[in-house]
Amino acid sequence: MSSDGIKEIDSDLIETNYDNVVYKFDDLNLKPNIVRGIFGYGYETPSAIQQRAILPITEGRDVLAQAQSGTGKTATFTISALQRIDENEKSTQALILAPTRELALQIKNVITSIGLYLNVTVHASIGGTSMQDDIEAFRSGVQVVVGTPGRVFDMIERRYFKTEKVKMFIMDEADEMLSSGFKEQIYNIFRLLPETTQVVLLSATMPQDVLEVTTKFMNNPVRILVKKDELTLEGIKQFYINVELEDYKFDCLCDLYDSISVTQAVIFCNTRSKVEFLTTKLKAENFTVSAIHADLPQAERDTIMKEFRSGSSRILIATDLLARGIDVQQVSLVINYDLPSNKENYIHRIGRGGRFGRKGVAINFVTERDVGMMREIEQFYSTQIEEMPADIGALFN
């Protein structure tokens, strides 16, 4: 494949050589238990890349997707891989490579969550972990392997990882991997896979290294180029309240609720213990509150989200688990009780309120220690977070 048509695109453009766009998860012909896992994970509607890439991947086509993090790309290949796995065949059927251990583990967790109701085994084969554990996992049989190139190649070469039944090879952040000195190992892995293996490649950019892979190892790929979703901060008014000290946050929250009338709000905290603390305190003040965090069983998360969507609970307190991929249409207010511990999550948290053109308000509680982080966030997103005006209530009338 030549590099024609592979180029940076305007933020509102999606460029592809594949015409089918599917706007609902229910219309993707997925196994019912995958759809259950998707909704449980927090997705309601597919993102731009999910609308376009899941179908060709589940059809077995080679796919080249240019997409950055924050577009829903991990769930795209996770859903597709789970759909293609034969649950009765215990051999490895899908191999996913990532440039770092952290990303590999993150992907494994997404697969485990979305595949919660399936009988699918997943294993992370990554450097820096026990070789023996790896060997045991391969001996006992794993259907999906997520790993870093060095360790995966090592396992294949030593014949612990048997590739005969692999039908999907997915490379996440391919540009990152190919520029980080993994090229030779990746090429060697390619050569040790069955010739019929489907190749799915995700990359934020399309340098020569990536295009070379598409030419050498991909068969007439579907190309999907999706720029990062820029609806993010548009239409969302961002404010901060200088609470000075952590201990003053709760009183500040109660004062805020006295001065505004809001249908529903999401409040973000950085830790599970803070979520639980705040939930208890607000319930004691007679607020109708739900809480959600990563340690809750999936069934419980499903119920909580259902209650919140139906409006029977007015405040949802959450950790960053919720910050990606959930569209709660009626939320007009997001409160960062804690500023996020990394800048990237800010947009996922507050983007919630303004999705699909809906206006929203985001209020950040800022202690003296948080001022630096808030300035970093402003710089990172080229945005301005203003001090909350005294007449904030007028925004909600």
From Swiss-Prot:
E.C. no: 3.6.4.13
Enzyme class: hydrolase
GO molecular function, one term: ATP binding
Pfam families listed in its UniProt record: DEAD, Helicase_C
InterPro entries from the UniProt entry: DEAD/DEAH_box_helicase_dom (IPR011545), Helicase_ATP-bd (IPR014001), Helicase_C-like (IPR001650), P-loop_NTPase (IPR027417), RNA-helicase_DEAD-box_CS (IPR000629), RNA_helicase_DEAD_Q_motif (IPR014014)
A cellular component annotation (GO) from this entry: cytoplasm
Catalytic activity entry: ATP + H2O = ADP + phosphate + H(+)
Segments forming domain Helicase ATP-binding: 54-224
Motif Q motif, chain ranges: 23-51
Domain Helicase C-terminal span(s) in chain numbering: 235-396
Binding residues for ATP: A67, Q68, S69, G70, T71, G72, K73, T74
Subcellular location: Cytoplasm
Motif range (DEAD box): 172-175
Annotated keywords: ATP-binding, Cytoplasm, Helicase, Hydrolase, Initiation factor, Nucleotide-binding, Protein biosynthesis, RNA-binding
Subunit note: Component of the eIF4F complex, which composition varies with external and internal environmental conditions. It is composed of at least eIF4A, eIF4E and eIF4G.
Record remark: domains: The Q motif is unique to and characteristic of the DEAD box family of RNA helicases and controls ATP binding and hydrolysis.
Physiological role: ATP-dependent RNA helicase which is a subunit of the eIF4F complex involved in cap recognition and is required for mRNA binding to ribosome. In the current model of translation initiation, eIF4A unwinds RNA secondary structures in the 5'-UTR of mRNAs which is necessary to allow efficient binding of the small ribosomal subunit, and subsequent scanning for the initiator codon.
Family assignment from sequence similarity: Belongs to the DEAD box helicase family. eIF4A subfamily.
Protein name, per record: ATP-dependent RNA helicase eIF4A
